[in-house]
Amino acid sequence: MKRVAIIGAGAAGCFCAALLREWAPELSVTVFEAGAKPMAKLAITGGGRCNLTNDFQGIQSLAEAYPRGERVMKRALKVFSQEDAIAWFTAHGVPCVLQEDHCWFPQSQDAMDVVRALQRAMRGADVRLNTKVISICHSFVVKTPQDDNPFDYVVVTTGGAPKGLPFLEGLELELVPPVPSLFTFTVKDAALNALTGLVLEAQMSLQGTSFKAQGPLLITDWGFSGPATLKLSSYAARHLAETGYKGTLAVNWLCANEEEVRGWLQRSASAHPQKLVSSVHPVQQRLWDYLLAKAGLREGLRWAELGSKGLNRLTAVLTHDTYPLSGKSKFREEFVTAGGVALSNIGLNTLESKQYPGLFFAGEVLDIDAITGGFNLQAAWSTGYVCAESILKCTRT
């Protein structure tokens, strides 16, 4: 009987175990998990609702969703796509619904339904909780504090946190240092922070770089959050880690260029010369008042009094409003890192180690990560599937 070890009982590891149990019940599958519960992160992702995947219709390219790991994901999605993921979970008792933002969720909006479906599918696997793997030797003996276990195949699915990687050190694999890749921005601006809860579509960029993102922007009492912020944090993850999470953020509040904004302001001045500038606003009133003050425009100013200098200042604030970045804050619903096992170590079609045939990697332990919106979980499903399929082929050749 061939023996398979899966190290890490997260989404990728449990999905891989479930597939192996369904496809090849004759295999012995052992799942090692250092924590007290399997799929603990999955149970709380998406605010406990579990954003299973995305329909990929809201992105222009795969690199937009996967800043790191696009090549692997292009191959993995051909093997197990987002449609395949929805079909699998539906067939396993988790009907799914698609939201307007392109995100797929369980119809019940309960992540535990996903957890329970995976637990049912992987029934028969030996799941060892509170069992930390200390090392893996070249002959695939998995060492734990309790005992040493020989295996024919090993799948590493420990996630991207640095604490999940030390047991790989003896294999001398190339590891990309992990850094946070989904977080919010800390901006110390009392007047801005007073606008807490305000949301609008905006463009964000990191001044002096090519990193930029567009989407709903949420103003918080500590700075910026929301999809636009999270996308930018993902795209610029390694750059920001290197700079100590310092820099200058630029916000385009209207998602329009200077010429377009200037034209709108001029038309407003022509159409409403005697109205107050504060009374005709392209954004929410509270934000508009804040931006007028930031542009140095006095209260009670009429459109006829705006003048060319006022027009220039207001155009600049609306299209390129800058804020010193003073740090990052954890995004509570996502725990994602950039980094992990370098993709140069593995076969891109099989996710098998080039140095150690029979050793596979899936999920966030690889140097693959994505923006928010279900893309990271899809990476777990797709890479877990590729590993299970690769092992099955190995056992039957």
Question: How should each PLM-predicted stretch be described?
Answer:
Residues 73-81, 100-120, 157-159, 163, ...:
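Short beta-strand to alpha-helix junction loop
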Residues 153-193:
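Glycine-rich loop(s) and the adjacent beta-strand/alpha-helix scaffold that form part
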Residues 5-7, 32, 133, 149-161, ...:
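Short hydrophobic core segments
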Residues 2-31, 387-392:
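N-terminal Rossmann-like FAD-binding beta1-loop-alpha1 element of flavoenzymes
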Residues 22-23, 37, 58-61, 78, ...:
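Residue-level recognition of phosphate/Mg2+-coordinating polar/acidic sites
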Residues 129-141:
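A conserved short coil-to-beta-strand element within the FAD-binding core of flavoproteins
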Residues 21-47:
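Glycine-rich FAD pyrophosphate-binding loop
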Residues 153, 159-160, 165-171, 367-396:
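A conserved FAD-binding loop/helix module that cradles the flavin
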